[in-house]
Design a protein with these regions (language model features):
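Active-site neighborhood of HAD-like aspartate-dependent phosphohydrolases
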Residues: 1-47
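Short, glycine/charged-enriched secondary-structure capping and boundary segments
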Residues: 19-22, 140-144
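A metal-dependent, Asp-based hydrolase signature
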Residues: 30, 42-96
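Substrate-recognition element of Asp-dependent hydrolases with the DxDx(T/V) motif
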Residues: 90-107, 111-141, 152-155
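Conserved H-loop
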Residues: 146-150
Length: 156
């Protein structure tokens, strides 16, 4: 039997559905930003978000599909209206965006049982993901599996 087990998160341990395409989540995110001193309409914040994502993904790299760190995108969005915003507040904006755009999140059947069983058997359990840390961490906590890993490696 193996001593170490490495898992991806989304599509392996967690089933999630997000909506970053329809108008409603952008309007809700804009309302949250406006309430925090960063006035936007939904279409304005979506356009800025899309522009920054496109700018960052267009940077030449040796990889065919590079995974960007999304925090700089939220930094641009936030600093446009609040130049002195803290890193913690930018992080909170990223978390709030994910909360708003998440339509469903749940563990796949037996996920907790498998992770707990491996730990009880003395095995090392690791998470290796190319996801966004700002999104992933709160979802690990929310689903109750954050403490089931010996270590967590997230690319962003």
């Amino acid at each position: 039997m193996y001593k170490n087990y490495i898992f991806d998160l989304y599509g392996t341990l967690i089933d999630i559905r997000t909506d970053e395409w329809s108008e409603e989540p952008w309007e809700e995110f804009a309302a949250w930003l406006t309430g925090n001193g960063m006035p936007y309409t939904g279409s304005e914040v979506k356009a800025l978000y899309d522009n920054e994502v496109n700018r960052l993904t267009s940077v030449k790299t040796k990889y065919t599909s590079p995974e960007i760190d999304i925090i700089p995108v939220f930094e641009v969005i936030c600093k446009k209206h609040r130049p002195d915003i803290t890193d913690e507040e930018v992080w909170k904006a990223g978390e709030q965006f994910r909360i708003i755009t998440t339509k469903m999140i749940k563990l796949y059947p037996n996920t907790k049982k498998v992770l707990t069983g491996l730990k009880k058997a003395g095995k090392k359990v690791y998470l290796l993901s190319n996801a966004q840390r700002v999104f992933t961490w709160q979802e690990l906590v929310k689903t109750g599996i954050v403490d089931d890993f010996d270590d967590i490696f997230i690319s962003s």
